[in-house]
Amino acid sequence: MSFTVIIPARFDSSRLPGKPLMKISGMTMIERVYAQSKKSHADRVIVATDSKKIFDEVILFGGQACMTSSHHQSGTDRLQEVAKLLDLPPKHIVVNVQGDEPLIPPEAINQVASNLAARDSVGVATLFEPIGNYEDFIDKNVVKVVIDNAGLALLFSRAPVPWPREDIIDNKVNRISVTDLPMRHIGIYAYRISTLNQFVSWPIATLERKELLEQLRFMWYGERIHVDKAVIEVPRGVDTKEDLEDVIKLLTTNL
């Protein structure tokens, strides 16, 4: 199986500006994401960015990077620009590793690429893990996913879905069945180039605009997304200063 990892990275994050260049135990965040991606089975790893600062940092640590337009609506749009510049064939698989996932396990990258390669009838593959506490369930920054019995996505949302009416009473956990836990979406994707090209041709979907979740554009226009349980725990990415501090603590503890 052949696949490419592309890492979209923006400097102007609304919640934590400049986070790709923030230091985590002596390395910038983007270098850590790149290093984790290189441990996967990918043929090539490249950073897609509209920031000269990020571009220069990647070149400095010996990585590959590509400058992109600053007008993209999403990381997927940015990724498609680079895939087009690389002239990758329509059936080639690209894995989108977010630029704020410094602890992304290479096993998760390999898993999502393999899942897509094994399924010709779907255009996108991604991962989930169970949510075991109420705080994460109601957190709008924790994206939830609902799937059908074939492992295909029915819905992605920042809202607490599916709402377990009998398990949660007056905003308190009455009980949560271990066999029916809600699912946290893990923001890693595998696509075929042909699917990426379709994505950028579609207008932004109404639901995508409401939730600010670009994967909803695929579903809005009828593309199927396969969602599998991650074979390994995937730490949450860095959206806030608190997330950054948590990652630093985790790395320090494991030294």
Segments predicted by a language model, with ranges:
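Short, acidic/turn-prone active-site loops that include or flank metal/cofactor-
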Residues: 11, 69-75, 232-234
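Conserved core of the sugar-phosphate nucleotidyltransferase
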Residues: 106-205
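N-terminal glycine-rich phosphate-binding loop and ensuing alpha1 helix
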Residues: 2-49
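A conserved hydrophobic position in a structured secondary element of the catalytic/binding core
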Residues: 49-50, 104, 191, 239
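Short phosphate-binding loop-to-helix
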Residues: 46, 52-114
